[in-house]
Amino acid sequence: MTIASVDRTIQLISTGAIAGSTCSPDLAKAPWEFDSGTPGYGPGSSMGDVIPAGSPRQGQLPESYRSAGTEELRERIRAAKETLGDRVVILGHFYQRDEVLQHADFVGDSFQLAQAARSRPAAEAIIFCGVHFMAETADLLSGPEQAVILPNLAAGCSMADMADIDSVTECWEQLEELYGTEPDADGRVPVIPVTYMNSSAALKGFCGEHGGIVCTSSNAETVLEWAFERGQRVLFFPDQHLGRNTAKAMGVPLEQMPMWNPRKPLGGSTAEELDAARVILWHGFCSVHKRFTVDQITTARAEHPGVRVIVHPECPMPVVDAADEYGSTDYIRKAIAAAPAGSTFAIGTEINMVQRLAAQHPEHTIFCLDPVVCPCSTMYRIHSGYLAWVLEALIAGDDKPAEVLNRITVSEDVAGYARIALERMLAAKPPAGAAAAVVEPVEASTTDTGDAAAPPVETSTTHAGA
């Protein structure tokens, strides 16, 4: 794997060795310094978001890992992987730092990695280098005897936290009081809940229990079509931008997409506005993708004539409208790989992925739309020190038994309904011929399953360590 270290970039900026800026000087520090302090998402894009009370916290990492250098940690991880062999599989999300991702057996987006977890039924432990909701989904789709491990329990997701089960349940009760529960003449119920993959297992379970479904950024249009066949309206959470951008591309007028603010009666809308709604959007967003602006696109076009601007659908609608294309992380990766040499790309997604793509494709000019280095706060909480810690704990020694640290489990009362919502998503297929119509369905199958599904990128041990 090509190393394109954002960590190194941050260190060089912090010492003045190179020009540039970061969104927080604390990014130059190790994540365990935040684990012992005031609860929060950490430095980076979510540093201004308020973390819910009771969010998981990570205990102190042992000193031998905190004081180890990059090369020592790399060798310890390599040795532990060699000892454990097929008993363990490491999954790494596109947004992870390269110092972690170089050790991954599979690299992909959240759902591709959940599929990868299911593809290794013989592995005793699945180490998920991502964030909490991703590890939960891996636990839902893996075997009951497999342990899913999150190296740092503080690696949550501010967007996923913006919709909690109590607030969604209260919203649902208000909507049922307004709409009733009886289907119309076509058999469609008043409202169908749809949750983005970037949500807690509890919300996936809520959708499964109430006739709803899960979506990814690559199959959101297919899922909304599924929901509209069964419901008069959709309640979409937690990301307003993915819901709005997808519904708009399907022809839903903006005036039929009211926002639901859980702190206000009827979400801040009138009964008449909700009655006319097609898609009710939860008041949530991704702090990484919220940073991208139309002004950044304007600057990119002025400084790089002919630039191809691709952004993630979690970006605000004006940014998506101003871009040339939008698509999931896997769509962005494939679009760059398929482009003729000499292409120039301005990318609106997380900096670790953008910088890695630039290193992997020297034949192109690739840069992040946001000139400020500001990684995902919670992805950044995963560090090779934590990875080495949970790996080495799985190895029994002369004076210690093997130990599973930071295991993520979903309770069975939630898991049953959550799996139903996921299976509904797996069964939803895009209509024949739809993939050529607009950008998003082109790669709708990349995180879906079935005959056309694209697997995550599988790496080899020797290649990963390069």
Task: Please give the residue ranges for each predicted region.
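Hydrophobic-composition signal
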Residues: 439-442, 454-457
